Swiss-Prot record:
This is Small ribosomal subunit protein uS12cz/uS12cy. One of its GO terms (molecular function) is structural constituent of ribosome. It is found in: Plastid, Chloroplast. GO terms for biological process: translation. It comes from Gossypium hirsutum. Belongs to the universal ribosomal protein uS12 family. The keyword Plastid applies. It comes from the Eukaryota. Keywords: Chloroplast, Plastid, Ribonucleoprotein, Ribosomal protein, RNA-binding, rRNA-binding. Its main location: plastid. With S4 and S5 plays an important role in translational accuracy. Located at the interface of the 30S and 50S subunits.
């Protein structure tokens, strides 16, 4: 516990909140161009080949973004929309690609939870 004299000399510093998605720069989403599309393996105890893309954002950042859903058409030079949101079992992946916008098409034959994968209501 500091003394009154110490507090007069040095005021208390407010706790700065650290953003979990710095590359978005306070925006809800950012547009970017895929520079590489590849798969990586999750950390223990999970096992899979998770689809990710290296994306150069309009803010100038180069980030790794997860491609959600089954199957995708993303390739190098695809223009994608990126939102925040980490993938718990992929270290360093703090962003998601938004399906159904720009060059990322929605998930094929999706019936439930369609809004998260950019799928229109079936006729």
């Amino acid at each position: 516990m500091p003394t009154i004299k110490q507090l007069i000399r040095n005021a208390r510093q407010p706790i700065r909140n650290v953003t979990k998605s710095p590359a978005l720069g306070g925006c809800p989403q950012r547009r970017g161009t895929c520079t590489r599309v590849y798969t990586i393996t999750p950390k223990k105890p999970n096992s899979a080949l998770r689809k990710v893309a290296r994306v150069r954002l309009t803010s100038g950042f180069e980030i790794t973004a997860y491609i959600p859903g089954i199957g995708h058409n993303s390739q190098e030079h695809s223009v994608v929309l990126v939102r925040g949101g980490r993938v718990k079992d992929l270290p360093g992946v703090r962003y998601h690609i938004v399906r159904g916008t720009l060059d990322a098409v929605g998930v094929k034959d999706r019936q439930q939870g369609r809004s998260k994968y950019g799928v229109k209501k079936p006729k």
